[in-house]
């Protein structure tokens, strides 16, 4: 698949290190949780989750994202996709718990909106390092109750999302969707495993991609061999039992990198 040329129509600074880029194309059939391969010309092609059907929300972390941050409205980048498996939509009347940390709120926000539109009850646990790093709080508040936690206590509960979860009855939810830094997701995984609700949960993983379509195997996770780009990036909690989650990932050479 050749990349389409996407022209930037609007840039919103969500926090000092996070920006949302709107572009002049809508992926009408996207599944919330799917990703696109973003071609930053002259640098690299990298995977990014869709925060709407016409936007990506980007955290500045490396060469490709730093180059993206140099772009202005009217500039363009290449897009391929959407690819992968998204989150499972709930049935009408089901209860959905969103657990979002940092920029992990980006792919979860369209899922929360789609779940609400399907007639589900949607509650959110939203975590970040500090108040200025909270992402899409207003979007989640428009759908249901939001429990906020910040590492420094600048807003909401002082602590981590797992500290908030201790005060919730997670067994009362029909579906639980999780995305955020992998250390956070690993903690949430253990919490949900202890309460025997992994079968209700789904996690969105981030790994190094090369092809993005399931051919090269660069993003396979141990021990199952599941491909994050094709079989994921969203996996059920039970699929991740005994996996590398929270332990290590792999770099471009295939070498293990401790998380």
Curated annotation (Swiss-Prot):
HAMAP family: DHODB_Fe_S_bind (MF_01211). Belongs to the PyrK family. The gene is pyrK. Keywords: 2Fe-2S, Electron transport, FAD, Flavoprotein, Iron, Iron-sulfur, Metal-binding, Pyrimidine biosynthesis, Transport. This is Probable dihydroorotate dehydrogenase B (NAD(+)), electron transfer subunit. Binds 1 [2Fe-2S] cluster per subunit. Binds 1 FAD per subunit. Residues 1-89 form the FAD-binding FR-type domain. InterPro entries: Cyt_c3_hydrogenase_gsu, Dihydroorotate_DH_ele_sf, Dihydroorotate_DH_Fe-S-bd, Dihydroorotate_DHASE_ETsu, FAD-bd_FR_type, FNR_nucleotide-bd, OxRdtase_FAD/NAD-bd, PyrK_electron_transfer. [2Fe-2S] cluster binds at residues 211, 216, 219, 229. PROSITE patterns: 2FE2S_FER_1, FAD_FR.
